[in-house]
């Protein structure tokens, strides 16, 4: 898990929402994922990224919802995933988003719904 933590950077991530019921038996990996993502070392990679813990007592399935800056959304159902699987999936999507941002010209990039007229 240390290797996944070392390469985890939240630069392209806008929001991480972790939702779980603490009284269910299958939430340990989701809670560990939340601890990892909300650590100071990981949070320092993007100070504009919000990490939200949504703790409910409704018996709901643990869920991790990651919103990237380009509008892409990653939803992981944590009931049958290990912490390592969730971290490696997030790291893989972050690498893909970084590669997509690097290949697109930065000056010509316009957010959807905006115009370039001044």
From Swiss-Prot:
What are the GO BP annotations of this UniProt entry? mitochondrial translation
Q: Which UniProt keywords apply?
A: Mitochondrion, Ribonucleoprotein, Ribosomal protein, Transit peptide
Q: What is its main location?
A: mitochondrion
Similarity comment text for this entry: Belongs to the mitochondrion-specific ribosomal protein mL53 family.
Q: How is the quaternary structure described?
A: Component of the mitochondrial ribosome large subunit (39S) which comprises a 16S rRNA and about 50 distinct proteins.
Show the PANTHER family listed in the entry. 39S RIBOSOMAL PROTEIN L53, MITOCHONDRIAL (PTHR33618), LARGE RIBOSOMAL SUBUNIT PROTEIN ML53 (PTHR33618:SF1)
Q: What is this protein called?
A: Large ribosomal subunit protein mL53
Organism, as annotated? Mus musculus (Mouse)
Q: What does UniProt list as this organism's lineage? A: Eukaryota, Metazoa, Chordata, Craniata, Vertebrata
Gene behind the chain = Mrpl53
């Amino acid at each position: 898990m240390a290797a996944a933590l070392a390469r985890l950077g939240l630069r392209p991530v806008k929001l991480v929402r972790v939702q779980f019921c603490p009284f269910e038996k299958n939430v340990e990996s989701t809670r560990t994922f939340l601890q990892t993502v909300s650590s100071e070392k990981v949070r320092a990679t993007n100070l504009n990224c919000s990490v939200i813990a949504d703790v409910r007592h409704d018996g709901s399935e643990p869920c991790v919802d990651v919103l990237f800056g380009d509008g892409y959304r990653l939803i992981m159902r944590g009931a049958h995933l290990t912490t390592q699987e969730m971290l490696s999936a997030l790291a893989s999507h972050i690498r893909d988003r970084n590669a997509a941002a690097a290949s697109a010209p930065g000056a010509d990039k316009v957010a959807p719904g905006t115009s370039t007229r001044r």
